[in-house]
Swiss-Prot record:
GO BP: any one term: embryonic hindlimb morphogenesis
Misc: This protein is produced by a bicistronic gene which also produces the guanine nucleotide-binding protein G(s) subunit alpha from an overlapping reading frame.
Name this protein carries in UniProt: Protein ALEX
Organism: Rattus norvegicus
Membrane topology summary: Peripheral membrane protein
Gene name of the record: Gnas
Predominant location category: membrane
Residue spans of biased composition, Low complexity class: 542-564, 615-626, 656-671
Compositional bias ranges of the Polar residues kind: 257-273, 387-396
A GO molecular-function descriptor: adenylate cyclase regulator activity
Presence of keyword Cell membrane: yes
Skewed-composition ranges (Pro residues): 410-438, 448-467, 476-485
Taxonomic superkingdom: Eukaryota
Length: 738
């Protein structure tokens, strides 16, 4: 690859070697040359890959070789013009080689002196197409000593500009207008270097105009082309306007290399009109109107205007086809109604109600005679008649229709021609934000305004209803209570199954609907226990009425019996606070997997379910021989022990009461944990954890000898265990719970 035009080098050239424009290294080792020559390695063919680059557009077209010149310029470069020739027509010193016309131009600085003649200089100011004319002078001076700077290599009618005459630098010296005077030391140095010419220094034989990106000789300011090229390569405006698809990145900082827009202006909210639409699929943050400060200021005004617009539409809306103007007789009756306003305030309410009813009936008759009455007045008349008849039968005072405020400047009330969507009985002072479900819709008569000192009278419903008791606010996880029964203290429905967030046990202090809340827990008796037909009295409420149940009527689980008689000491247990259902279910499954649920021999499914729902505090509290994670060492769990105690007829009532009520007093029944073990209770249980023996004995680290599945398999294969029966019982308990 040939060097670019801007990388012209100065090196010595062997005069005996054939000039090759493309070779860099010599073919054979040449002798050391006496002359330092300048050689410009020109391009044979232009590089097409560089012709499209912006650098070539600024600096001009690529340099061309001599074969690109015009025919007129070729005529001035004939071989006969370059000094003496040998008889064969070749240059002296080139041997028998005769170069072609395009290579006949010598690129050496000058040839060796032949007799008294010298090689005429060759001047090519610019080889680029469209540049100054390239020519070779044919005039030879008479003597070599008379060579002058003014006539060397120049035509008589042409004077090149100073920047085109001597563009190159040889040995650090510059030729041209800024060259030193002939008497200076540098000029003497050049004279010694140019020992061939005892006269002045001659400029280069081949003068080429440099590239436009090269700085001129002796000038420190860059050319306009050079500045334009540097701007083209370094300016951020030529970069493609890349935009990140992420709107967060576009709002975070300006583009890379941007120096025009500061960060504060870039991150400022821009209006939707000024923002450039993006083609990305992600939501655009600039498209929202909330980022525009001008639009955000106008938003509350728009909201108020929108809220006020429906009211204006309702006031300005024309009447519908059904709600035409009332007949003239009706207008007269309405105007005559104003006469009844003054005595209304002095008359009692029943009389006022009768007057209103008679008035509307008369209006209806007169309007039917002249014109059919609108359906709104018929409905109004029926409602008023029902209200007046009910008030007379019940003897309750009926509130009158509020009369409008009578003032001198106030016009008569408008006729009932408003849209049916807006209730006419709505007072003007009522805020429009009140939900429509709370608006009274009983009467459709125009409700006039009240005087300043009078409070509005609440209207009653058309049909009297019994007042329903207000619902009590229950805690977040508590289900609603069952429906109230006709009997004041008895609930006919069993307690519903509670959601998974709660326990399966009955609530301790959950009174029925309509009963006062109990300060203390209520005592409950379960079916199957002695004394279940006795009366129970809630503690702290001796004044509640007693209700006797027949002995043959079974008592459902979780059913309370308030009673008026004192309770004997051997009554049923007191319920404890409920446990979480998740914990109870976990223990059920754990006992099912371990096979430690004892079977029930003489119990049915209902009693088993009743026993499952009871879980005293003694069952939740771990006995001394119970592991924290793996339950008691005996083959029973707490809730199953209580089930066995309730099912076995031999268990003492006092022991069951004490164990169920978590009595701190020691008892024999509590010490044996109220369970019927299948194996010998005196036999020590097999330890589950064996201590390591050896050097690590002092560390007291537990080491399990076998897995849990092996223990279950061994327990099932033992002769003294009823593991399958206990597992079936546990499945029955679990099914009853759900």
């Amino acid at each position: 690859m040939s060097p670019s035009p801007t990388r012209l080098t100065v090196r010595s050239v062997d005069p005996l070697k054939t000039p090759n424009l493309t070779s860099r290294a010599p073919v054979r080792p040449s002798r050391k040359s006496k002359w330092a020559e300048t050689t410009a390695h020109l391009q044979r063919k232009p590089c097409h890959s560089r012709s499209n680059s912006p650098a070539w557009e600024i600096s001009g077209p690529p340099w061309s070789s001599l074969d690109h010149l015009d025919p007129i310029r070729h005529q001035s470069l004939q071989p006969s013009d370059f000094g003496a020739r040998t008889p064969t027509g070749a240059h002296p010193g080139l041997g028998a080689y005769s170069p072609p016309p395009e290579e006949a131009m010598p690129f050496e600085f000058n040839e060796p002196a032949q007799e008294d003649r010298c090689q005429p200089p060759l001047q090519v100011p610019d080889l680029a197409p469209g540049g100054p004319e390239a020519w070779v002078s044919r005039a030879l001076p008479a003597e070599p000593g008379n060579l002058g700077f003014e006539n060397t290599g120049f035509r008589e009618d042409y004077s090149p500009p100073p920047e085109e005459s001597v563009p190159f630098q040889l040995d650090g010296e510059e030729f041209g207008g800024d060259s030193p005077p002939p008497d200076s030391a540098s000029h003497a140095t050049n004279r010694h270097w140019r020992f061939e010419f005892p006269t002045v220094a001659v400029p280069s034989t081949l003068c080429l105009r440099p590239a436009r990106t090269r700085l001129p000789s002796g000038s420190r300011a860059p050319l306009a082309d050079h500045a334009r090229l540097s701007d083209l390569l370094t300016s951020h405006t030529t970069f493609p306007q890349w935009r990140s698809p992420d709107p967060c990145l576009r709002l975070a900082e300006p583009p890379l290399g941007s120096t025009t827009t500061p960060l504060s202006i870039w991150t400022a909210p821009q209006s939707q009109v000024m923002a450039r639409p993006s083609k990305s699929r992600e939501p655009q943050l600039r498209a929202s109107t909330q980022r525009d400060p001008h639009l955000s200021d106008k938003q509350p005004r728009q909201e108020t205007a929108l809220s006020a617009a429906p009211l204006q539409r309702r006031q300005k809306s024309p009447p519908s086809s059904e709600e035409k103007d009332p007949p003239p007789n009706l207008k007269q009756c309405i105007s005559s109604q104003l006469l009844l306003r003054s005595p209304e305030r002095t008359l009692p309410k029943p009389i006022r109600t009768q007057l209103h009813t008679q008035f509307f009936r008369s209006v209806l008759r007169k309007s039917e005679e002249s014109q059919p009455c609108p359906p709104i007045f018929r409905l109004l008349l029926k409602m008023r008649a029902q209200m007046s008849g009910q008030n007379q039968t019940e003897g309750q005072p009926q509130p009158p229709l509020p009369s409008p405020k009578t003032t001198e400047n106030q016009p008569p009330p408008p006729p009932p021609s408003q849209p049916p969507s807006q209730p006419l009985s709505q007072p003007p002072s009522q805020p429009p934000s009140q939900p429509p479900s709370q608006l009274p819709r009983q009467s459709l008569t125009p409700k006039p305004s009240l005087p300043p000192g009078q409070s509005p009278t609440p209207k009653r419903s058309p049909q009297p209803r019994q007042p329903l008791p207000r619902r009590r606010s229950l805690p977040p996880g508590q289900p609603p209570s069952p429906l109230r029964s006709p009997l004041p203290g008895l609930s006919l429905l069993p307690e519903p199954i509670q959601p998974p967030g709660l326990s399966l046990e009955p609530q301790r202090c959950q009174p029925l609907l309509g009963q006062p809340p109990l300060e203390q827990p209520m005592q409950v008796l379960w079916s199957g226990e002695p004394g279940h037909s006795r009366l129970l009295q809630p503690l702290g409420h001796p004044s509640l009425p007693a209700q006797q149940l027949p002995p043959e009527q079974p008592l459902l689980p979780a059913q309370s019996l308030p009673a008026g008689q004192p309770l004997p000491p051997q009554a049923g247990p007191i319920l404890d606070p409920p446990a979480r259902r998740s914990r109870l279910l976990t223990r059920l499954l754990r006992g099912l997997l371990r096979g430690r649920v004892p079977g029930l021999t003489n119990t049915n499914v209902a009693e088993a379910a009743a026993g499952m729902r009871l879980r005293p505090a003694s069952a939740r509290s771990s006995p001394p021989a119970m592991s924290r994670k793996k339950g008691p060492l005996a083959a029973s769990s707490g809730f199953c022990g209580e089930t066995a105690a309730l099912a076995s007829p031999g268990a003492t009532q006092s022991g069951a009461t004490r164990s169920a009520t978590s009595s701190p007093e020691p008892s024999e029944a509590a010490s044996v944990y109220l369970s019927v073990p299948d194996h010998d209770p005196s036999a020590p249980g097999r330890p589950r954890i064996l201590w390591k023996r050896g050097a690590n004995r002092c560390a007291k680290k537990p080491w399990r000898c076998e897995s849990r599945s092996a223990q279950i398999r061994n327990a099932a294969s033992s002769s003294t265990s009823n593991w399958r029966r206990r597992r079936w019982t546990t499945c029955v308990h679990t099914a009853c719970c759900f």
